[in-house]
Amino acid sequence: RQMWNQRHANVWVWVELVVVLVLLWYSIDLVYNYEVAARQSKGYDTENVFDIQLNIKPALQNDSVLMSHSAEYLEQIYHLIQQYQGVEEACFYYGTIPYTGNNMYEGYAPHSDSTHVVGCFIRYVSPTYFKVFRLQPLSGSFEAERWDKNEYPMPVLMSETLSDSLFSGRNGVGETCFNPYFLNSVQPETNYKVMAVLPAHKTDEYERYEPFIYLPSSPLTYWHHIAVRVASNSIPGFTERFMQDMQGKLSIGPYYLYDINS
């Protein structure tokens, strides 16, 4: 009789217990999946890689004389970065930036089926990007001398995930595709050819694999990110040394060193 009288309280105890068990199960499952994801390769190697950002001095951004020599200044800056002690290789790129949440996303379709559009993350990169981030193709090969926006068809590298989605599991090397969103632009680029297929890619350790495409970058500008691979014995204190040594040296024309991080 006492249990019957306390039946409402007992029901709430069971409800609370079920809620706690569900939350506990969810937490364990979440941690497990994070750990599994963290052990999977991102598809590219960011260890010993530092990201360098430039910016324009506000007082000089409207100086037409200085800005007309922008390419020369940036070339000097890039050369100084390449020559800095401990730097093994340098590159520049823009689009989807690892670990920042700054992503560029568009769709591509194979010429064989223009209705089959696959969305993917994009990176526009210089030829040395693949050395800095140690990208090794699964099939095909990277040809630096052909990595040019003016090459026709324009060469691209794709992650395995994108290649499989676009070309129905066929080896994507040598296949062609186009970006339907560019068709109405002044100078539409209608033909991309897959130079090589890369391992599956993630934006960081804890994300799932997503379709990725790499395209040749335009010449270096201030909005590009510059990445450098640093020798292992130069890693300790590299950020602080670089900022101290290069803050003044990279202040060329309207540009200055904005940030460096690993």
Spell out what each predicted region is:
Residues 6, 81-85, 169, 249:
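Acidic-histidine catalytic/liganding microenvironments
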Residues 31-116, 149:
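Membrane-proximal extracellular/periplasmic loop immediately following the first transmembrane helix
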Residues 34, 52, 81, 87-90, ...:
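Generic structural signal for small/hydrophobic residues in well-ordered secondary structure
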Residues 116-210:
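Hydrophobic secondary-structure segments that place a key small or acidic residue at a functional site
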Residues 16, 51-54, 90-94, 119, ...:
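Short beta-strand segments
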Residues 6-36, 44:
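Short, strongly hydrophobic transmembrane alpha-helices
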Residues 1-4, 77:
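A short amphipathic helical element positioned immediately N-terminal to and/or at the very start
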Residues 82, 153, 160-162, 185-262:
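"Rare, low-scoring activations can occur
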